[in-house]
Amino acid sequence: MHIHLQNPADDPLFDFSHEMWDAAAARAPDLGGGHEVSVGRTGADFDTAIATAEALVCDASVIKAHFPCHAPRLLLLFVTNAGLDRLAPFDWLPPGVILMNNRGTHSVKAGEFGIMSLLMLANRVPEMVTHQRAGNWRKLWGAAVAGETVTIVGLGSLGGSIARHASGFGMDVIGVRANPAPHPHCGRVIGTGALDTALPDTRFLVLACPLTPATRGLIDRRRIGLLPEGAGVVNIGRGELVDQNALCDSLDAGKLRGAVLDVFDPEPIPPGHRLWTTKNLIVSPHTAADDPATYNPISLDLFLENLLAWRSGRALPNQFDIARGY
């Protein structure tokens, strides 16, 4: 099988290499030999490889730059991103090609960022930063998170990892997802349709769900108004999940105590945008769930796990469901 790894044109921090592939293959002894592996960066590299590649591993920027294209032998496409909403509609995907994402790559880093954000909010760090910028000395008293209620929307690898940390700190964890099946780290799980019932008792709201037609604008002005005074918000999902203006209004008015946001609409945030000056808001530049040291090695491990599943006729753990959007 010809497997091609295409690096992004402008982000060498997340490059693949032959050495990285060899290390991943050594961790998958069932892979066997006989594979031709190519690594490219330029458009010419891609054009040469895609003529014979049966599997392609790349990030979303490569898809946007080179698809649709003639890929006569392509069978498997593994995209090294978890959320593929920016690739919709998927009419660029060659017929019969199995599309996968890299969900699972981000879980460790996202979990740590999530619990860090909750601890920052509980200890009023966003407020401290606002006072620091203004040159104000003002004592602010934080509180322990044990016993506080955190509502986590989305219980995939990101939200589930945050739930694990939050439960370990003794928090009361409410999970929210389309299918309200129990989760080992949530005291209870409710369906998305029941979100309004949880918000009035939510001390911290965490958004970790994918962007789909059903979740776009999920946290609108009305739902922000359902949160209790002094609540905090964390968003590591997508900026479009939230009415940003309503969130900024609530922060500036002091109704919400703080927010930690890693995702925005648009990205990057333009100069002069109100997000830069909103009170008690921490801006993280969409890096919360990415660790350059482990990102590609974990992604390759997941790709090989899926390749072995495909080869043996089993379900692919990372197959992307276009209809559901994740």
Identify the meaning behind each predicted range.
Residues 66-73, 90-94, 224-229, 250-255, ...:
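Short, conserved loop/helix-junction motifs that constitute active-site signature segments
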